[in-house]
Amino acid sequence: MAIYLPKQNPDYRVELAKLINGYLAEREWSPARLARESGQSKATISRITNYKNGNPKNQPSLRTIQAIALALKLSREQRKELFDTAFPEFRVWEEAAEQGYTVDETNDILYEKGLPLLTTER
């Protein structure tokens, strides 16, 4: 069986940049302030807030998104929106769990959406 790792659809990162920039505008914060408050490097925050179909390998980590959420003091609903935007595969995982999908069925949905698979073989 061939190993297949799909490229993650980069569109979500454009949406993530818009979302975080919106939170910054609401608070009248600069990306530099977000970097300070979140403990992330200015370069990391810049990659996230200035993303325009750039390097597809630049995906923020779960820890980075959590640090941003804490720094911005987001509500529960805002945190969910942030994480769902940063990690669109989470929505598929949630649906799969709720609907009782198998790993193969879940991988089929992830594959169709250009998201990372649960397994390395396809």
Each PLM stretch: what is its role?
Residues 39-60, 84-85:
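Recognition helix of helix-turn-helix/homeodomain-like DNA-binding domains
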Residues 86-101:
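Charged, helix-prone or intrinsically disordered regulatory segments positioned adjacent to compact structured domains
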Residues 32, 43-46, 77:
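Key DNA-contact positions within bacterial/archaeal DNA-binding proteins
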Residues 60-78:
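DNA major-groove recognition helix of helix-turn-helix/homeodomain DNA-binding modules
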Residues 1-33, 104-122:
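A short, Lys/Arg-rich alpha-helix, primarily the initiator
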Residues 30-38, 68:
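Short alpha-helical "recognition helix" segments of helix-turn-helix
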Residues 73-90:
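Short C-terminal boundary/hinge segments that cap the last helix of small helical domains
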